[in-house]
């Protein structure tokens, strides 16, 4: 496997990988959060929201994106962001083709991203994910890579009632 800088030629493949990678996540998350919250975040469905958000990432910050290839096929990608005011880098997006999950692709993308962040002079790296059951595999990967969970509580109240 090799990891290369993003090219717009990879855009559609990365969007496809992301939707397939997160296909099992969102139904489980939907079951774990209040309906009014899910509907507020995903009024046109999770796929539409994710596509919109990911297109923006790929179009607005291509220099922050790295792509994992197996042969000539893209199998995953990662986007990093640097927050110098906090001396911190962030793994903002990570997605691995379901056919290549649990083969070390995510781990290698995490290590690649962490090295880029360290090379930028940052003192720490952060990754954020959901606490719902759909995101349990992501949390397991992050913990296996030495990330420590920061307890955060996020509350929502339905004002339509």
Question: Which residues does each PLM region occupy?
Answer:
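Conserved active-site tyrosine of GNAT-family acetyltransferases
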Residues: 142, 147
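Conserved residues at the C-terminal ends of beta-strands
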Residues: 81, 128, 153
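Conserved G/P- and acidic residue-centered "switch" motifs that form tight phosphate/ATP-binding loops
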Residues: 104
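Conserved beta-strand-loop-alpha-helix junction that forms the acyl-donor binding cleft
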Residues: 101, 126-138, 156-160
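Extreme N-terminal starter segment of soluble prokaryotic enzymes
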Residues: 1-2
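Acetyl-CoA-dependent GNAT
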Residues: 5-92, 97, 110-111, 116, ...
């Amino acid at each position: 496997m090799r990891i290369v800088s993003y090219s717009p030629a990879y855009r559609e493949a990365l969007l496809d990988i992301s939707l397939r990678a997160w296909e099992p996540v969102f139904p489980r998350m939907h079951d774990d959060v209040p309906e009014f919250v899910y509907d507020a975040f995903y009024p046109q469905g999770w796929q539409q929201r994710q596509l919109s958000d990911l297109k923006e990432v790929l179009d607005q910050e291509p220099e922050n994106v790295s792509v994992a290839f197996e042969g000539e096929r893209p199998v995953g990608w990662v986007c990093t962001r640097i927050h110098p005011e906090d001396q911190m880098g962030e793994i903002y997006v990570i997605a691995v083709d379901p056919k290549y999950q649990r083969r070390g692709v995510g781990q290698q993308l995490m290590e690649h991203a962490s090295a880029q962040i360290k090379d930028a002079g940052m003192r720490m790296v952060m990754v954020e994910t959901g606490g719902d059951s759909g995101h349990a595999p992501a949390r397991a990967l992050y913990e296996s890579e030495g990330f420590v969970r920061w307890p955060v509580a996020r509350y929502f109240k339905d004002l339509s009632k």
